[in-house]
């Protein structure tokens, strides 16, 4: 059995025979996008490109972003969030499995009233972390200042999109806070929990 991305048949309008395309290309044609890994520059650029392309192709049809991510890099995650706010179609966000760290930030960035979690999904928020522990003192201070700015940005977005007070979000981001789907709904990160 071959290992890799599964292929599915797809027939373009006006064609008699179907051609085999990988499952993700087929789903993209239906405006279904997937973040199923840690956020990095590569997946961020792919999702941004798809959202912009699909928005240009038809700005009246909504986009659906399925999320199962342990988090990842802050700047590429913020770029995905900003693109979701920029494109004209509404972006539905659907948490399946885990939306942690940057994954939860992208989840909360979906169109308000169109953010959903599957019943057994988990959501986790926390403050951004630095990977530059071995930097010189001067570099570390600059890094810490940038980290504080990023933390403030993320906190403001969570406050705006959840309706929670600033002090609650700030306190919760001090540590890893895990939530069930219903707890994430009560917190305001998602609007709906899918029924079993």
UniProtKB/Swiss-Prot annotation:
**Which cellular components does GO assign to this protein?**
chloroplast stroma; endopeptidase Clp complex
**Localization in the cell:** Plastid, Chloroplast stroma
Principal localisation: plastid
- Enzyme class per UniProt: hydrolase
For this entry, the protein name equals ATP-dependent Clp protease proteolytic subunit
Q: Does the keyword Plastid apply?
A: yes
Per its UniProt record, what Gene3D superfamilies does this chain match?
2-enoyl-CoA Hydratase, Chain A, domain 1
Q: Which UniProt keywords apply?
A: Chloroplast, Hydrolase, Plastid, Protease, Serine protease
Q: Please describe the quaternary structure of this protein.
A: Component of the chloroplastic Clp protease core complex.
């Amino acid at each position: 059995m071959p290992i890799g991305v599964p292929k599915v048949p797809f027939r373009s309008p006006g064609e008699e025979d179907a051609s085999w395309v990988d499952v993700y290309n087929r789903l993209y044609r239906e405006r279904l996008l997937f973040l199923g890994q840690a956020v990095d520059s590569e997946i961020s650029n792919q999702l941004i490109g798809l959202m912009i392309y699909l928005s240009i192709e038809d700005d009246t049809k909504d986009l659906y972003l399925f999320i199962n991510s342990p988090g990842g890099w802050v700047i590429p995650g913020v770029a995905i969030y900003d693109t979701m706010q920029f494109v004209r179609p509404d972006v539905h966000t659907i948490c399946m499995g885990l939306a942690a760290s940057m994954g939860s930030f992208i989840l909360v960035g979906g169109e308000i009233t169109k953010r959903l979690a599957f019943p057994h999904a988990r959501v986790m928020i926390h403050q951004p972390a630095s990977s530059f522990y071995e930097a010189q003192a001067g570099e570390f201070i600059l890094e810490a200042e940038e980290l504080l700015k990023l933390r403030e940005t993320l906190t403001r977005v969570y406050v705006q999109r959840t309706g929670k007070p600033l002090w609650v979000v700030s306190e919760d981001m001090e540590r890893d806070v895990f939530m069930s789907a219903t707890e994430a709904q009560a917190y305001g990160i998602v609007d709906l929990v899918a029924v079993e």
